[in-house]
């Protein structure tokens, strides 16, 4: 797209910016006519990005009383497990139907957010990564036995969380989930066909769509 076309697009559509959230709404669209919206989440999972995601959904629900569906396009390599779980619990209780779409890569703690919806799509070349959680070693020194055990206990807490959520949104056997979350060498990488076989993707390939309201979330630093 040429610079001239980009300038014309900017003039035609109002672009609003809040922190690392950009949203576009057509000039001719009335708030009461909006029944479908999209959020493109292209970021790691952390306290700030999850807050942006949840606040964007709240803003859509608050501004557009006739909203029926929100399509959430995820591209995330994962990040903080606690933030991912908080988002999972908030999203799965959403009064508005949320459709999760793997837009390219959904990995690690981002898979928790993906599993928050019963409507799970993917783009044709998208992939998933399921693997063990990692616990931080805040003591950058030699570890005593009890300190090492605490790190292992923290990791197992998050791996148990992975298994519990995966057992609710996939058909992966319990023994296989145990293996996946026990060793990085047993990590599972799924393309869309294999993700469908295990139930992680339970809808068809997502077709291109246009939306009257679109939000973009990124953790890119300006």
Predicted features along the sequence, with ranges:
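N-terminal organellar transit peptides
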Residues: 1-107, 116-222
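Thiamine diphosphate
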Residues: 110
């Amino acid at each position: 797209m040429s610079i001239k076309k980009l300038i014309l697009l900017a003039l035609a559509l109002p672009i609003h910016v809040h922190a690392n959230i950009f949203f576009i709404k057509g000039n001719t669209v009335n708030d009461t006519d909006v029944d479908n919206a999209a959020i493109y989440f292209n970021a790691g999972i952390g306290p700030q990005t999850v807050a942006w995601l949840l606040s964007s959904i709240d803003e859509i629900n608050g501004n557009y009383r006739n909203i029926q569906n929100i399509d959430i396009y995820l591209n995330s390599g994962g990040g903080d497990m606690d933030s991912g779980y908080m988002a999972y619990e908030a999203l799965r209780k959403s009064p508005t139907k949320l459709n999760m779409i793997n837009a390219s890569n959904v990995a690690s703690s981002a898979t928790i957010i993906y599993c928050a919806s019963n409507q799970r799509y993917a783009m044709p070349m998208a992939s998933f990564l399921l693997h063990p959680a990692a616990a931080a070693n805040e003591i950058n020194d030699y570890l005593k036995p009890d300190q090492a055990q605490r790190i292992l206990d923290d990791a197992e807490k998050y791996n148990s969380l992975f298994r519990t959520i995966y057992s609710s949104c996939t058909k992966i056997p319990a023994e296989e989930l145990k293996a996946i979350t026990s060793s990085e060498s047993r990590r599972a990488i799924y393309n869309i066909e294999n993700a469908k076989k295990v139930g992680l993707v339970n809808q068809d390939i997502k077709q291109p769509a246009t939306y009257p309201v679109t939000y973009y979330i990124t953790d890119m630093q300006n």
